[in-house]
Each structure stands twice: as structure tokens, then as C-alpha cells.
């Protein structure tokens, strides 16, 4: 759970919870089928990082942390971040936040055959890939709070104790290695955190409750 550990290769695949394990189990199933030569279709696995965007209120507690922080600021005038943990200072734990529109465009890219669409007269080829789908840049929770304040106005940051029982299951750092994605020929631009937050809450602030 540190820098350099987010390349989708076997030595780096150590899920921290059952949800991650279930995703990895399916990837292994597909990889085995590929190795056996029994999967004659194009399969692309996109490993999403921390997705956020407009219209998340209906998701309740499963909404993104950016949505929850925004609601805290609107409702209470403050945002609660964890104190230092995992070698990171107060609020300095980092995540790769990816704007939902970027992922929609990425899915469409591959759904439309991406780099593998056959040219006129060519036979369609089949390809397989498991790649990261993120922005490629980690940002701290302090930076998230500051980006939200640009939209909602100043708020107080309150640092709360990090739960000791969470340490072994918590990702203190995530950043997508996009090498595999770039190798497919996909070079779609990533929306910055600041621009994504601004667009998200310009549309949805009345629906935060």
C-alpha cells in the first residue's frame, strides 16, 4: 500500500478485503482462460480507483469520500480528516481520485474497440488486458478539503484519531500506474481534482441532502 505498488501484476496483487479479493478472483479466472486459449474474445479489465462525480446523493454511505466531505462542509462548516497514519501526516494520506466522466469516456473507448478496431479489409483481432483506470496522480485529503473550500467557501479542518483496528486494512496511499493503459494506445486526458470538484458541485450542491 505504498508508492510503486499499483501496477496490475501478480506480485502486487494483495487485496485488503473480501471485495478486492472477489475482483481479483475473477481476473485470475479470465487470465487462466486466456492462457488456455479458451477465450477467443476481446476482454479488457478496468481497475477503477477512487471515482467521484455529480449526482451521488442516492448512494448514501457508499457515495465517494469527496461527496461526504462536501456534505460535512455544507452541513457543519467543517470537514473531518484522519490524523497522521502509515507514515503520512495529518490529512496527508493520499488517493488517486478519478472523475466519473473520464471513466465513462474510457469505457466508451474500449467498447468501440479502442486501439483494436480493424482497418478496412482486415480481420478483427482479439486482445486481452487488465489495466488501471485512474488519474495517475495521487492527491492528499488536505488537498481535497482545499478544493472543496474553493467551491463552498472556507471551512475548518478537524483532525480525528486514526482507528488502530483499521491500520492493516487501510490504504494510506493509492496512485494508478497507467503504463498498461498507455500501452493499449489510450491516452485520454485526466480531469484535475480541482476542475472535477468544481464541476461536480456546481451541478449537485442543491442535492447534497
Regions found by a protein language model. Give the residues of each.
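A broad detector of the eukaryotic-type serine/threonine protein kinase catalytic domain
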Residues: 11, 53-56, 186
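Active-site helix of classical SDR
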Residues: 22
Amino acid at each position: 500500500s505504498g508508492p510503486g505498488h499499483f501496477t496490475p501484476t501478480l506480485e502486487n496483487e494483495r487485496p485488503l478485503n473480501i471485495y478486492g479479493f472477489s475482483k481479483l478472483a475473477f481476473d485470475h479466472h479470465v487470465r487462466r482462460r486466456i492462457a488456455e486459449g479458451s477465450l477467443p474474445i476481446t476482454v479488457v479489465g478496468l481497475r477503477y480507483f477512487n471515482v467521484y462525480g455529480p449526482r451521488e446523493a442516492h448512494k448514501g454511505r457508499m457515495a465517494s469520500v469527496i461527496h461526504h466531505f462536501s456534505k460535512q462542509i455544507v452541513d457543519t462548516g467543517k470537514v473531518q480528516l484522519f490524523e497522521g497514519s502509515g507514515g503520512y501526516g495529518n490529512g496527508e494520506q493520499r488517493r488517486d481520485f478519478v472523475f466519473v466522466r473520464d471513466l465513462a469516456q474510457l469505457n466508451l473507448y474500449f467498447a468501440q474497440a479502442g486501439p483494436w478496431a480493424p482497418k478496412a479489409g482486415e480481420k478483427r483481432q482479439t486482445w486481452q488486458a487488465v489495466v488501471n483506470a485512474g488519474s495517475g496522480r495521487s492527491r492528499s485529503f488536505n488537498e481535497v478539503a482545499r478544493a472543496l473550500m474553493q467551491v463552498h467557501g472556507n471551512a475548518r479542518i478537524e483532525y480525528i484519531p486514526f482507528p488502530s483496528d483499521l491500520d492493516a486494512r487501510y490504504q494510506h496511499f493509492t496512485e494508478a500506474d497507467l503504463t498498461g493503459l498507455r500501452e493499449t494506445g489510450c491516452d485520454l486526458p485526466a480531469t484535475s481534482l480541482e476542475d472535477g470538484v468544481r464541476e461536480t458541485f456546481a451541478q449537485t450542491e442543491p442535492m447534497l441532502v
